[in-house]
Amino acid sequence: MKFTKMQGAGNDYVYVDCTKLPLANPSEVAVRVSDRHFGIGSDGLILIKPSDNADFFMEMYNADGSQGQMCGNGIRCVGKYVYDNGLTDKTTVNVETLAGIKILKLNVGDDGKVASVVVNMGKPELEASKVPVDVNALVEYKAAYRNTYKNDAKLCPLAVKALDNVENAVINEAILVDGKSYDITGVSMGNPHDIVYLDNDMDITKFDIEKVGPYFENHKAFPERINTEFVQVLDRKTLNMRVWERGSGETFACGTGTCATVVATVLN
């Protein structure tokens, strides 16, 4: 198997060109190559495949072999891979994923290689049942946001627009995890995220994400498991974030998670 290892913001995957030949047992391969001691070492496996609906299809697997719907950093690397390896000469590339078709804008440097990629990540999904979050598994679903935005529509026009036609959103709702109460906000960017805000007076590098992360990931409130972002708001333009990805554990970065975190921070 020929492969290329690439990273976006430290979010690293093993990439395989499957445009001509398929890869057998990709879930099993993902587990083997992702092992950082006995394999190549990565957050997962990404296959670049043909598509009937777009230029390419991105098929991704987490480190535990489970299939994911979307990866923001991963799809940026797909854009660089297909251009730099001559699979396309387009600088606007459409890539199909399980979360829909994403449009990539490639910035080509003077050396003829892709220097950066901008991705249209699409509209965030806030409807609880579509994130999905089971509101019945929360401490007590209050939906207090409804009165907040109804009583003061000028509070945040972006939030008001995002919540249009949303019946039940999970915004700053309490959840009991390993005996402790946390407030979460649920957002889907094609894959499920819950955002948790931490106190600024704590050292986020010492937060025990290895212990807490799996409890969130496998909580009964999240029927498809969950990616969890633990966030500190340093100021109105700066966030500090650590992420626990379902199926992969803590990763250096998460593109969809960063988008979900910004959405959640606006909502809050």
Question: Can you describe what each PLM-predicted range is?
Answer:
Residues 1-113, 156-157, 194-268:
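A glycine-rich beta-to-alpha transition motif near the start of alpha/beta enzyme domains, typified by
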Residues 98-197:
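ATP-dependent small-molecule kinase catalytic core of the GHMP/sugar-kinase superfamily
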